[in-house]
């Protein structure tokens, strides 16, 4: 026989500090949120981007997590088998820098932070399954980073090359292009330098075209646009010009303007620059190339002043006319786009026009507005598509896209051009010269070169006793013993690669590892692949062209490796906004506008903080923190408590019937369900608050104590559970529930009860609202106006006055105009 549960006496007033720790401990003890696969249920994999273990969850973490938690709880109550894991993105520079500052090993600092943040997450009251938790700094995790790297290497997707890279002088490490924002390090804000280094890259460009296909993932339009722009597909032609240093191929999206090309421009880094530079120009070119090398690509593209450049002294031969055109070097041309050289058409390109005006170069019109007169393109370029002119056999053809194919075909027949598609996307630079990251699993043999570490020797663990002060070279180079290795081909001595991987490698596939976080045979157990893809992924839009693009690339490689059948890691992505400081600025310690959620929980309880963060603003937009705003949700939850447990409701008796109450309950239930579908959390809270007002009135009406009243309390309790899980659980158990409210089914909408044959509309007198009337939805204009005239609050403003006009907008408004 089951022992009856011993309950403590119920508190008369709502006390979250007594309720919340009790239920958090109980849920954990009972394993309420532990995921178990159940083929009889439809799976729902819900995932929120995992945090960096900085030491404390800030209010932004709460904002990012509580709304998706409510959504996951709602899905579970609807009968879905919800998988909702969480872990920690634990490698990276902040841990290394903090460890340097405090004289700790990064592993010690990170582990302590994870332990603290885990407790904070639990006090948030989430339904996270912590049995699947992971930390990317654990060797059992980064072993698979290394395994993937070796597999990418074998497939030709990981390679090493020399080249100009972005260098952060403060963090003393290389940055990927995506980590440079406005010429500065994304993390620390330091101006970025350019250095020539040998680095490892992943060949994301092999998947550029496929990454432009979003058919298998539901992403916000803004994210799709950002990724599309970053990939930067351009369709055009490669055209070859003869030069003294051999043929030079340029890429253009406007082959229709070829006859207007009056000079070539090469990037300062272009390998032909030395050979094309004449002795007379050698010193000027050398100085210019050196100066350009001190600028980042972003700075070169964004400079608003006069164009700069230098003449090489050499000329190219125009492939059609045979004319000699000068070859220049200018830093507005990038080696990383196209071929690193352009044909300049100053009459029809703004940058080329500015350059030609600056240096007195020829400007030749070859495109004219359709039906228009010749333009003075020496004063301003014409960049429209127009009609081709001054171009021999091409004259009269439409400019732009319409003529690309026939013009390329003709140039191809002449042997000077071919069709070409290019992408702005560059391969992903993954080498980092810091300690706290995944060691790159490559050894270097004098006889066999770079060789991947065999799978049975993984993980290559980080050495523990290393001096990791930033010096510009990897700290791993300081551990000579760790560097010693054996060549897997010949068994001879070899040396380890001493760089570590970009931490975005860690987060590119972590959503798969949750399926079996302790599996030592596979990155993830294929037996659990039925949980894929992630059904709902949530996080900040700031990751649009970093993490979100890299994870899509990683999934496509995994598919080609036979590890998954998915084309995309996420079926649906939604982004939350940002909670700003009270001053409307981004929260930061230096501004003194940081809100500590732990302080709020100590004062108000987790349920109040949860509901306020869902109520404060549309979730996808965010907004400024209002310190007084949290009092509203706090008072609301106290009213909810009183609704269930106070004997009487103060106030005059209300006239609410069963049909009225059931309409309020079921119409709210229907609205809340629709709002969960569109993730409109602020309107969910607003609807529940409004229903609370109705229930408080109903408690003072004849409907109190009836079956309709009991149904209302039951449904409201279950609607409350996803947003305020602790108070909802306490109410449920106090009302006799033997199982958790979080194991209950979401209530079914009674469509008949949720629909009314009548409608309540406002009545205006001379444009001002004076009352409301309830009329049939099919009422005629005369019936509606008669009801309005009879309303006592309306009659006070119409009696003794002349009626000028009466207006009835069916179902919307009545207006009686008097004088």
Curated annotation (Swiss-Prot):
Binding residues annotated for ATP, in chain numbering: 589
Family matches, as SUPFAM superfamilies: Anticodon-binding domain of a subclass of class I aminoacyl-tRNA synthetases (SSF47323), Nucleotidylyl transferase (SSF52374), ValRS/IleRS/LeuRS editing domain (SSF50677)
Motif placement: 'KMSKS' region: 586-590
Cell location: Cytoplasm
Top-level EC class: ligase
GO BP, sorted A to Z: leucyl-tRNA aminoacylation
Keywords noted in UniProt: Aminoacyl-tRNA synthetase, ATP-binding, Cytoplasm, Ligase, Nucleotide-binding, Protein biosynthesis
Catalysis performed (reactions): tRNA(Leu) + L-leucine + ATP = L-leucyl-tRNA(Leu) + AMP + diphosphate
Gene Ontology cellular component list: cytosol
Alphabetized HAMAP family for the sequence: Leu_tRNA_synth_B (MF_00049_B)
Protein name: Leucine--tRNA ligase
């Amino acid at each position: 026989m089951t022992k009856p549960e011993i309950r403590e006496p119920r508190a008369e007033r709502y006390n979250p500090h007594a309720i919340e720790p009790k239920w958090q401990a109980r849920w954990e003890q009972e394993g309420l949120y532990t995921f178990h696969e159940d083929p009889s249920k439809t799976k729902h994999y819900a995932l929120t981007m995992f945090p960096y273990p900085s030491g404390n969850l800030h209010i932004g973490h709460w904002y990012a997590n509580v709304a998706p938690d409510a959504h996951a709880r709602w899905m579970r109550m609807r009968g879905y088998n919800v998988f909702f894991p969480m872990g920690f993105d634990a490698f990276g520079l902040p841990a290394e820098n903090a460890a340097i500052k405090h004289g700790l090993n990064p592993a010690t600092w990170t582990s302590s932070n994870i332990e603290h943040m885990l407790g904070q997450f639990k006090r948030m009251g989430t339904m996270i399954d912590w049995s699947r938790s992971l930390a990317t700094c654990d060797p059992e995790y980064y072993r698979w980073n290394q395994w993937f790297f070796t597999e990418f290497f074998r497939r030709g997707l990981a390679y090493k090359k020399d080249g100009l890279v972005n260098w952060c002088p403060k963090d003393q490490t290389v940055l990927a292009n995506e980590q440079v924002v406005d010429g500065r390090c994304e993390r620390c804000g330091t101006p970025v330098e350019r250095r020539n280094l040998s680095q490892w890259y992943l060949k994301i460009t092999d998947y550029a075209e496929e990454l432009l296909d979003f058919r298998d993932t539901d992403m916000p339009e803004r994210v799709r646009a950002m990724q599309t722009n970053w990939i930067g597909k351009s369709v055009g032609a490669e055209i070859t010009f003869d030069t003294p240093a051999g043929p030079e191929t340029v890429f253009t999206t406007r082959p229709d303007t070829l006859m207007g090309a009056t000079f070539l421009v090469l990037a300062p880094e272009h390998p032909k620059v030395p050979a094309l530079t004449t002795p007379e120009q050698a010193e000027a070119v050398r100085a210019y190339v050196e100066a350009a090398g001190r600028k980042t690509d972003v700075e070169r593209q964004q400079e608003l002043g006069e164009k700069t450049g230098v003449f090489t002294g050499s000329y190219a031969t125009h492939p059609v006319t045979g004319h000699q055109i000068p070859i220049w070097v200018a830093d507005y041309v990038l080696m990383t786009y196209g071929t690193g050289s352009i044909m300049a058409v100053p009459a029809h390109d703004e940058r080329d026009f500015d350059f030609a005006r600056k240096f007195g170069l020829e400007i030749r019109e070859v495109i004219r507005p359709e039906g228009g007169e010749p333009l003075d393109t020496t004063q301003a370029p014409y960049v429209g598509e127009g009609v081709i002119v001054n171009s021999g056999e091409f004259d009269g053809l439409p400019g732009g896209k319409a003529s690309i194919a026939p013009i390329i075909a003709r140039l191809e027949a002449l042997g000077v051009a071919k069709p070409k598609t290019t992408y702005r996307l560059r391969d992903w630079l993954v080498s980092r010269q810091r300690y706290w990251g995944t060691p790159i699993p490559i050894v270097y043999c004098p006889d066999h070169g770079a060789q991947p570490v065999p799978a049975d020797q993984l993980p290559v663990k980080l050495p523990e006793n290393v001096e990791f002060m930033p010096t510009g070279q990897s700290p791993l180079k300081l551990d000579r013993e760790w560097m010693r290795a054996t060549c897997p081909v010949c068994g001879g001595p070899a040396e380890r690669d001493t760089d570590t991987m970009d931490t975005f490698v860690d987060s590119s596939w972590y959503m798969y590892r949750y399926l079996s976080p302790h599996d030592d045979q596979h990155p993830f157990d294929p037996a659990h692949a039925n949980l894929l893809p992630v059904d709902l992924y949530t996080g900040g839009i700031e990751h649009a062209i970093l993490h979100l693009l890299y994870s899509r690339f990683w999934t496509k490689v995994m598919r080609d490796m036979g590890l998954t059948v998915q084309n995309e890691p996420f079926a649906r992505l939604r982004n939350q906004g940002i909670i700003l400081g009270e001053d409307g600025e981004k929260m930061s310690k230096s501004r003194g506008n940081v809100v500590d959620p732990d302080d709020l929980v100590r004062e108000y309880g987790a349920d109040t903080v949860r509901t306020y963060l869902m109520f404060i603003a549309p979730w996808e937009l965010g907004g400024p923190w209002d310190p007084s705003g949290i009092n509203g949700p706090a008072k609301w939850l106290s009213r909810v408590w009183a609704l269930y447990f106070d004997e009487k409701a103060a106030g005059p008796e209300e006239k609410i019937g069963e049909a009225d109450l059931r309409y309020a309950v079921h119409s709210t239930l229907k609205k809340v369900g629709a709002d969960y579908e569109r993730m409109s959390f602020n309107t969910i809270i607003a609807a529940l608050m409004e229903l609370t007002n109705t229930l408080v009135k109903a408690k003072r009406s004849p409907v109190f104590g009836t079956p309709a009243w009991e149904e209302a309390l039951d449904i409201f309790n279950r609607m409350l559970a996803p947003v305020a899980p602790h108070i909802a659980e306490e109410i449920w158990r106090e009302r006799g529930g033997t199982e958790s409210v979080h194991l209950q089914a979401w209530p079914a909408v009674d469509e008949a009860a949720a629909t009314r044959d009548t409608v309540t509309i406002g009545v205006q007198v001379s444009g001002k609202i004076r009352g409301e009337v309830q009329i049939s939805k099919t009422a005629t204009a005369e019936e509606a106006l008669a009801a309005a005239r009879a309303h006592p609050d309306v009659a006070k403003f119409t009696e003794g006055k002349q009626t000028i006009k009466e207006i009835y907008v069916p179902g919307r408004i009545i207006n009686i105009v008097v004088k």
